Amino acid sequence: MRIGIISVGPGNIMNLYRGVKRASENFEDVSIELVESPRNDLYDLLFIPGVGHFGEGMRRLRENDLIDFVRKHVEDERYVVGVCLGMQLLFEESEEAPGVKGLSLIEGNVVKLRSRRLPHMGWNEVIFKDTFPNGYYYFVHTYRAVCEEEHVLGTTEYDGEIFPSAVRKGRILGFQFHPEKSSKIGRKLLEKVIECSLSRR
Protein backbone atom coordinates (compact mmCIF):
# COMPACT_ATOMS: atom_id res chain seq x y z
CA MET A 1 0.00 0.00 0.00
CA ARG A 2 1.31 3.44 -0.94
CA ILE A 3 0.33 6.52 1.07
CA GLY A 4 1.09 10.05 -0.12
CA ILE A 5 1.10 13.24 1.98
CA ILE A 6 1.03 16.49 0.00
CA SER A 7 3.91 18.67 1.17
CA VAL A 8 3.74 22.16 -0.34
CA GLY A 9 3.64 24.55 2.60
CA PRO A 10 2.94 24.87 6.31
CA GLY A 11 0.61 22.28 7.74
CA ASN A 12 2.16 20.08 10.42
CA ILE A 13 3.32 17.88 7.56
CA MET A 14 6.03 16.06 9.50
CA ASN A 15 3.69 15.59 12.47
CA LEU A 16 1.13 14.03 10.13
CA TYR A 17 3.86 11.92 8.51
CA ARG A 18 4.91 10.56 11.90
CA GLY A 19 1.27 10.03 12.91
CA VAL A 20 0.48 8.08 9.75
CA LYS A 21 3.71 6.10 10.12
CA ARG A 22 2.77 5.05 13.66
CA ALA A 23 -0.76 4.19 12.56
CA SER A 24 0.58 2.01 9.73
CA GLU A 25 2.76 -0.16 11.97
CA ASN A 26 0.11 -2.88 12.26
CA PHE A 27 -0.27 -3.16 8.48
CA GLU A 28 2.06 -4.96 6.07
CA ASP A 29 3.89 -3.44 3.11
CA VAL A 30 2.96 0.21 3.68
CA SER A 31 5.13 2.97 2.24
CA ILE A 32 4.62 6.67 2.99
CA GLU A 33 5.91 9.47 0.76
CA LEU A 34 5.86 13.27 0.86
CA VAL A 35 4.43 14.66 -2.38
CA GLU A 36 5.68 18.00 -3.72
CA SER A 37 4.73 17.54 -7.39
CA PRO A 38 2.53 15.25 -9.50
CA ARG A 39 3.60 11.63 -9.99
CA ASN A 40 2.87 9.32 -12.89
CA ASP A 41 1.28 6.75 -10.61
CA LEU A 42 -1.41 7.26 -8.00
CA TYR A 43 -1.42 6.54 -4.28
CA ASP A 44 -3.84 4.20 -2.56
CA LEU A 45 -4.39 6.93 0.05
CA LEU A 46 -3.60 10.63 -0.38
CA PHE A 47 -3.58 13.16 2.48
CA ILE A 48 -4.01 16.91 2.01
CA PRO A 49 -2.78 18.61 5.20
CA GLY A 50 -2.65 22.34 5.78
CA VAL A 51 -2.89 25.25 8.17
CA GLY A 52 -3.41 28.92 7.44
CA HIS A 53 -5.28 30.79 4.73
CA PHE A 54 -7.68 29.16 2.24
CA GLY A 55 -6.44 31.27 -0.68
CA GLU A 56 -2.82 30.52 0.10
CA GLY A 57 -3.54 26.80 0.34
CA MET A 58 -5.17 26.73 -3.09
CA ARG A 59 -2.35 28.85 -4.55
CA ARG A 60 0.25 26.32 -3.39
CA LEU A 61 -1.69 23.41 -4.87
CA ARG A 62 -2.12 25.29 -8.14
CA GLU A 63 1.52 26.42 -8.42
CA ASN A 64 2.74 22.87 -7.79
CA ASP A 65 0.33 21.40 -10.39
CA LEU A 66 -1.35 19.27 -7.74
CA ILE A 67 -5.02 20.13 -8.30
CA ASP A 68 -5.51 17.74 -11.22
CA PHE A 69 -3.33 15.18 -9.42
CA VAL A 70 -5.75 15.21 -6.47
CA ARG A 71 -8.76 14.99 -8.79
CA LYS A 72 -7.27 11.98 -10.60
CA HIS A 73 -7.25 10.13 -7.27
CA VAL A 74 -10.94 10.90 -6.84
CA GLU A 75 -11.74 9.85 -10.41
CA ASP A 76 -9.91 6.56 -9.82
CA GLU A 77 -11.82 6.07 -6.55
CA ARG A 78 -8.72 6.27 -4.36
CA TYR A 79 -9.04 7.63 -0.84
CA VAL A 80 -8.36 11.36 -0.45
CA VAL A 81 -8.24 12.80 3.08
CA GLY A 82 -8.16 16.51 3.94
CA VAL A 83 -6.93 17.54 7.39
CA CYS A 84 -7.66 20.97 8.97
CA LEU A 85 -7.24 23.50 6.12
CA GLY A 86 -7.01 20.48 3.83
CA MET A 87 -10.60 19.61 4.72
CA GLN A 88 -11.76 23.15 3.90
CA LEU A 89 -10.02 23.01 0.52
CA LEU A 90 -12.26 20.07 -0.43
CA PHE A 91 -15.20 22.50 -0.71
CA GLU A 92 -16.19 25.00 -3.39
CA GLU A 93 -15.23 28.30 -1.75
CA SER A 94 -14.53 30.08 1.54
CA GLU A 95 -15.44 33.41 3.10
CA GLU A 96 -11.77 33.68 3.99
CA ALA A 97 -10.79 34.09 0.33
CA PRO A 98 -13.62 35.57 -1.77
CA GLY A 99 -13.34 34.67 -5.44
CA VAL A 100 -10.93 31.77 -4.88
CA LYS A 101 -12.26 28.41 -6.03
CA GLY A 102 -11.64 25.38 -3.84
CA LEU A 103 -11.14 21.84 -5.09
CA SER A 104 -14.95 21.48 -5.31
CA LEU A 105 -14.80 17.78 -4.46
CA ILE A 106 -17.65 18.17 -1.95
CA GLU A 107 -20.59 20.53 -2.50
CA GLY A 108 -20.63 23.31 0.08
CA ASN A 109 -18.63 26.26 1.34
CA VAL A 110 -16.62 27.45 4.33
CA VAL A 111 -17.67 30.25 6.70
CA LYS A 112 -16.29 31.84 9.85
CA LEU A 113 -17.33 30.42 13.20
CA ARG A 114 -19.82 32.69 14.99
CA SER A 115 -17.96 32.74 18.31
CA ARG A 116 -16.02 35.81 19.42
CA ARG A 117 -13.51 33.44 21.03
CA LEU A 118 -11.43 32.54 18.01
CA PRO A 119 -9.59 30.54 16.99
CA HIS A 120 -11.30 27.43 18.30
CA MET A 121 -8.22 25.84 19.84
CA GLY A 122 -7.79 22.78 22.04
CA TRP A 123 -9.52 19.50 22.74
CA ASN A 124 -13.17 19.10 21.84
CA GLU A 125 -15.59 16.24 21.35
CA VAL A 126 -16.38 14.74 17.95
CA ILE A 127 -19.53 12.64 17.58
CA PHE A 128 -19.31 10.42 14.50
CA LYS A 129 -22.27 8.86 12.71
CA ASP A 130 -20.28 5.68 12.10
CA THR A 131 -16.90 4.11 11.27
CA PHE A 132 -14.61 6.31 13.39
CA PRO A 133 -14.15 6.52 17.19
CA ASN A 134 -16.10 9.15 19.12
CA GLY A 135 -14.04 11.17 21.56
CA TYR A 136 -11.95 14.28 22.11
CA TYR A 137 -9.70 15.48 19.30
CA TYR A 138 -7.40 18.50 18.97
CA PHE A 139 -8.62 21.54 17.00
CA VAL A 140 -7.06 24.79 15.76
CA HIS A 141 -9.31 26.69 13.33
CA THR A 142 -11.44 29.79 12.76
CA TYR A 143 -13.57 28.67 9.81
CA ARG A 144 -16.03 25.79 9.44
CA ALA A 145 -17.69 23.87 6.63
CA VAL A 146 -21.32 24.23 5.57
CA CYS A 147 -22.62 21.29 3.54
CA GLU A 148 -25.54 18.94 3.02
CA GLU A 149 -26.33 16.58 5.89
CA GLU A 150 -25.54 13.56 3.70
CA HIS A 151 -21.87 14.60 3.70
CA VAL A 152 -21.61 15.20 7.47
CA LEU A 153 -19.70 12.33 9.07
CA GLY A 154 -19.12 13.88 12.50
CA THR A 155 -20.11 16.99 14.45
CA THR A 156 -18.66 19.17 17.20
CA GLU A 157 -20.13 21.96 19.34
CA TYR A 158 -18.17 25.11 20.11
CA ASP A 159 -19.57 28.09 22.00
CA GLY A 160 -23.14 27.04 21.16
CA GLU A 161 -22.51 26.38 17.47
CA ILE A 162 -22.65 22.85 16.07
CA PHE A 163 -20.57 22.33 12.95
CA PRO A 164 -19.33 19.45 10.74
CA SER A 165 -15.95 18.42 12.14
CA ALA A 166 -15.73 15.44 9.77
CA VAL A 167 -17.17 15.03 6.29
CA ARG A 168 -17.37 12.28 3.72
CA LYS A 169 -18.38 11.87 0.11
CA GLY A 170 -17.60 8.39 -1.16
CA ARG A 171 -13.87 7.92 -0.64
CA ILE A 172 -13.25 11.61 0.05
CA LEU A 173 -12.81 12.29 3.78
CA GLY A 174 -12.23 15.51 5.68
CA PHE A 175 -11.27 16.07 9.31
CA GLN A 176 -11.31 19.62 10.71
CA PHE A 177 -9.30 18.50 13.74
CA HIS A 178 -5.71 17.22 13.80
CA PRO A 179 -5.64 13.42 14.26
CA GLU A 180 -1.84 13.54 14.38
CA LYS A 181 -2.07 15.74 17.50
CA SER A 182 -4.90 13.79 19.10
CA SER A 183 -2.98 11.13 21.03
CA LYS A 184 -4.26 7.54 21.09
CA ILE A 185 -7.68 8.30 19.64
CA GLY A 186 -6.08 10.13 16.72
CA ARG A 187 -3.93 7.08 16.03
CA LYS A 188 -7.02 4.85 16.12
CA LEU A 189 -8.74 7.12 13.62
CA LEU A 190 -5.75 7.05 11.25
CA GLU A 191 -5.60 3.26 11.57
CA LYS A 192 -9.27 3.14 10.56
CA VAL A 193 -8.58 5.38 7.56
CA ILE A 194 -5.80 3.03 6.42
CA GLU A 195 -8.06 0.02 6.99
CA CYS A 196 -10.85 1.60 4.90
CA SER A 197 -8.39 2.39 2.12
CA LEU A 198 -7.02 -1.15 2.09
CA SER A 199 -10.51 -2.62 1.86
CA ARG A 200 -11.60 0.10 -0.64
CA ARG A 201 -14.89 0.55 1.19
From Swiss-Prot:
Which positions fall inside the Glutamine amidotransferase type-1 domain? 2-201
Q: Which controlled-vocabulary keywords does the entry list?
A: Amino-acid biosynthesis, Cytoplasm, Glutamine amidotransferase, Histidine biosynthesis, Hydrolase, Lyase
Subunit record text:
Heterodimer of HisH and HisF.
Pathway where it operates: Amino-acid biosynthesis; L-histidine biosynthesis; L-histidine from 5-phospho-alpha-D-ribose 1-diphosphate: step 5/9
**Is the Hydrolase keyword given for this protein?**
yes
Question: In its UniProt entry, what is this protein called?
Answer: Imidazole glycerol phosphate synthase subunit HisH
Catalytic site positions: C84 (nucleophile), H178, E180
Q: Which domain of life is it from?
A: Bacteria
Reaction(s) catalysed by this chain's protein: 5-[(5-phospho-1-deoxy-D-ribulos-1-ylimino)methylamino]-1-(5-phospho-beta-D-ribosyl)imidazole-4-carboxamide + L-glutamine = D-erythro-1-(imidazol-4-yl)glycerol 3-phosphate + 5-amino-1-(5-phospho-beta-D-ribosyl)imidazole-4-carboxamide + L-glutamate + H(+); L-glutamine + H2O = L-glutamate + NH4(+)
Q: What is its EC number?
A: 4.3.2.10, 3.5.1.2
Q: Which organism is it from?
A: Thermotoga maritima (strain ATCC 43589 / DSM 3109 / JCM 10099 / NBRC 100826 / MSB8)
Q: What's one GO BP annotation on this UniProt entry?
A: L-histidine biosynthetic process
